[in-house]
C-alpha cells in the first residue's frame, strides 16, 4: 500500500526525532531543495545532511498542530524546539510547505519564527 504524503512526513519526523537523520533523508529526493524563507536555501541531499548535522546538536522536538494535504503538497504547522551550540533550547513556530515527487520529499518552503528559549 502506498503511503500518503502525510504518513511519509510523519515517518520522516519520527526518524529525525529519534536522532536518525539518515532515515529521514531516505524520505527525500536526491535533488531536494529546502528554502528557509528570508534566510537561506539548501540544494541537494548532501546540503541538507550537513545542515542537519550542525542544526540538530540534539534531535529536535516537534509538536505538529496541523497537517493539510492537497495533491503533491503537504502543509505542516507547529512548534519545534532545537538546542543551540551553547546547549540552550530555543523554541520556534513554523509553517512548512512540502512538495512531494514519486513518494519522496522534493521541496520545502519553511517559514520559521523564533518564539523563545528555555
Could you describe each region identified by the protein language model?
Residues 1-4, 8-17, 35, 39, ...:
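A beta-strand edge to alpha-helix "cap/lid" segment located at domain peripheries
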Residues 18-35:
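Short, well-ordered alpha-helical segments enriched in acidic and aromatic residues
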Amino acid at each position: 500500500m502506498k503511503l500518503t504524503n502525510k504518513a511519509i512526513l510523519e515517518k520522516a519526523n519520527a526518524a529525525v526525532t529519534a536522532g536518525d537523520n539518515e532515515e529521514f533523508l531516505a524520505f527525500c529526493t536526491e535533488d531536494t531543495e529546502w528554502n528557509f524563507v528570508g534566510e537561506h536555501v539548501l540544494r541537494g541531499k548532501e546540503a541538507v545532511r550537513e545542515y542537519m548535522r550542525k542544526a540538530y546538536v540534539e534531535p529536535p522536538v516537534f509538536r505538529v498542530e496541523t497537517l493539510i494535504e492537497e495533491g503533491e503538497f503537504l502543509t505542516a504547522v507547529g512548534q519545534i524546539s532545537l538546542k543551540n551550540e551553547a546547549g540552550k533550547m530555543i523554541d520556534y513556530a513554523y509553517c512548512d510547505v512540502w512538495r512531494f515527487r514519486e513518494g519522496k520529499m522534493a521541496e520545502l518552503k519553511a517559514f520559521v519564527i523564533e518564539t523563545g528559549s528555555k
